[in-house]
A protein has these predicted regions:
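N-terminally biased helix-coil "hinge/interface" segments that flank
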Residues: 1-216
Length: 216
């Protein structure tokens, strides 16, 4: 913002003439490092509740007997198993029941969670069960943020897909709030062009996409 003000004062820049605007931010990364993100719960396939604890069984220093892995962003008591099952072929073996989802949701809200992350087995192949549970939660708790791993990062490998969705749910409210303020200030200063946000892979995305997929 300071640079924009300097260009206006020194060179007579008209913000309305700006045709390309890209912004990079570390708000999401800082949120993870500082561990001050959103209070969220994880709903996963029943009997796979240890996905974040097991991870890839790697430790930071393999030859150090005292090496400790970082604690998961979601503690084990906020991980809830849902009775559902998708086969690796994408065929539904067990469809989720609303009563089961409602019980898990009630427990998550009672624990103080303000958002839900969904990551079911094989949802990268077929997101039907995840999207069904997302719709149930949106009906039972309107306005509660819900992140689906199948929508966020639909790739094979359960831990990688789950942790990506968890990070997205963890940082999304903070990133969205930051981008809302950022866009408001720029528009107030007269910038009218589309606002692009730098992605972690070096590309760019629109600001609306950045709000929805904060982990990218």
């Amino acid at each position: 913002m300071t640079a924009l003000e300097i260009l206006q004062a020194r060179d007579g820049l008209d913000p309305a003439e700006i045709s390309y605007f890209t912004h990079g931010t570390t708000v999401g990364v800082n949120t993870v490092i500082q561990r001050n993100g959103h209070d969220i719960a994880l709903f996963t396939t029943r009997n796979f509740e240890d996905v974040l604890e097991v991870a890839r069984l790697k430790i930071p220093q393999i030859h150090n007997l005292y090496s400790v892995r970082p604690a998961p962003l979601i503690s084990r008591d906020r991980v809830f198993g849902i009775d559902e099952r998708m086969q690796a072929t994408g065929d539904v073996l067990v469809a989720p029941r609303e009563a089961d989802v409602a019980a898990a949701l009630e427990a998550a809200l009672a624990a103080g969670c303000r958002g839900i992350v969904l990551s079911f087995l094989h949802s990268y192949r077929n997101p039907q069960n995840e999207l069904a549970v997302k719709a149930m939660i949106e009906k039972l708790a309107p306005g509660l943020p819900v992140v689906s791993s199948a929508e966020t990062w639909p790739i094979i490998r359960e831990f990688e897909r789950t942790i990506t969705a968890v990070i997205s749910g963890y940082v999304q409210p903070r990133v969205a709030h930051y981008l809302d303020r950022f866009e408001t200030v720029l528009r107030d200063k007269g910038v009218t062009c589309p606002l692009l946000i730098t992605k972690t892979n070096g590309g760019v995305m629109g600001i609306d996409q950045a709000r929805a997929n904060a982990c990218r």
